[in-house]
Amino acid sequence: MPVRPMCLAVLCLSVLLPASAAAQYGVRGSVPDPATGESYHLEVSGLLWSPTPTLLISSESLGIAGDQIDFVNDFGFENTRFRQLRVALRPARKHKLRFEYTPISYSSEGLLSRSVVFNGQRFDISLPVQADVRWRAMRFGYEWDFIYRDRGYLGLLIDTKYTDVQASLENRIVGREFVSARAPIPTVGVVGRGYVLPNVSITGEFSLFRLPEGIDENYQGRYYDFDLYGTVNFTDNFGAQGGYRSLTVFYRVDDDTGDLKLRGMYFGGVIRF
């Protein structure tokens, strides 16, 4: 079984098995006893994410096909640590409104080991080139926990992931050339949480979007988002988090393409009210 579905399956079992045991032994009308950190209406997380990037982009202009540029290998982009903000508003026990913002930025200057065509212009190996990639990743979503227990839950995710990517190359001869891709992307997914200790939880979620093939071969799109993390709650109002995030975006618009991946560990803190 693939690792991601297996992780979510384990979380599902951690939620469902206690409920089955309670039903088997006739537990009825028990008083809710939420785990530490589950009694809140507003949750705010500040995280530091250190992903390993894959950034493959090509851009056509004026009928001139562009080369696929590997911004990591061609320009030596290094792993960078990014700040991430997550906010969850919880008006009711099983319902959450979620927001997330991650500003992503890479920049490097150097000599190319090969000549490339980008946005209709040729960048040769003889001159230094300034390369920049900016990616604003935002998320607006709703979570419905259709199974909710004191020691875990299983829920449905409905999100809009707003992606704003801009890549540019610049040198003294050509000047600055850039390409951008902006779009709100609807995704659906699942989320599950289980408590391994009264104050320690493991949470996993996976959401996706895939444009059906065959509609128009000039337009393609895929979006996959996997997140697995643990939380240690010191009190109901404060905790520490650490986990692994994998974000994959692929798009094709006519002859412009982008294949973007960010995968890596993160850590931070969470406060609740």
Mark where each language-model region is:
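Short glycine/proline- and aromatic-enriched beta-strand/turn motifs that initiate or cap beta-hairpins
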Residues: 23-104, 268, 272
